[in-house]
């Protein structure tokens, strides 16, 4: 979590500069239409903050530095050992712990944000390739319900091949109905 949010700022700034848009990250964020993404950029990415205790925010840099020095290498080691020991090409798990809610200001609250990324956050912070496959639509929300696959470091192409094979098994979902 600290790695992805902290690096989102730098990566977006680099992208905007390299692509020659002439826009700043703040200008791009001003035009974000999705309330949850806008909330994340305005509340966390641009000010370089992370969710803290009791619905507060804290400076991201100390947590990022600690993650890069200690937590990330330990997580990468754990994943590497898990994939090797169990001879796995991928780990499969639900993308999110519950059916997504519609995009609105509450969907980007710190509590909801943390809850919705909790399953995908470890692999992301370890720098692993990940692939999300929509499998069904929620009964009432009609929003996609997905399965996530994380692969060993450097297995991007193999993970895509696995995803394409699974698409043959599960098929493709129709687009959610327009609201």
Question: Where are each of the predicted segments found?
Answer:
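Structural helix-boundary/capping segments
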Residues: 14-21, 57, 125-179
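Short, surface-exposed loop/helix-turn segments at secondary-structure junctions
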Residues: 64, 100-117
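Small-aliphatic-rich amphipathic alpha-helix that forms the alpha element of a beta-alpha
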Residues: 78-81, 110-134
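Glycine-rich phosphate-binding loop signature in dinucleotide/nucleotide-binding domains
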Residues: 84-87
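Glycine-rich, N-terminal phosphate-binding loop of Rossmann-like dinucleotide-binding domains
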Residues: 95
């Amino acid at each position: 979590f600290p790695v992805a949010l902290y690096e989102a700022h730098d990566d977006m700034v680099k992208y905007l500069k390299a692509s020659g848009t002439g826009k700043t990250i703040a200008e791009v964020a001003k035009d974000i239409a999705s309330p949850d993404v806008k909330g994340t950029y305005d509340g966390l990415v641009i000010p370089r903050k992370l969710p803290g205790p009791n619905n507060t925010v804290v400076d991201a840099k100390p947590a990022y530095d600690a993650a890069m020095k200690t937590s990330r290498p330990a997580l990468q080691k754990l994943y590497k050992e898990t994939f090797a020991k169990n001879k796995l090409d991928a780990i499969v798990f639900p993308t999110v712990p519950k059916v997504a809610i519609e995009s609105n200001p509450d969907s980007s609250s710190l509590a909801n944000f943390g809850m919705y990324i909790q399953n995908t956050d470890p692999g992301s912070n370890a720098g692993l390739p990940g692939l999300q496959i929509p499998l069904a639509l929620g009964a009432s929300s009609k929003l996609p319900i997905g399965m996530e696959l994380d692969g060993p470091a450097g297995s991007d192409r193999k993970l895509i091949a696995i995803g394409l094979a699974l698409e043959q098994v599960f098929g493709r979902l129709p687009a959610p109905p327009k609201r």
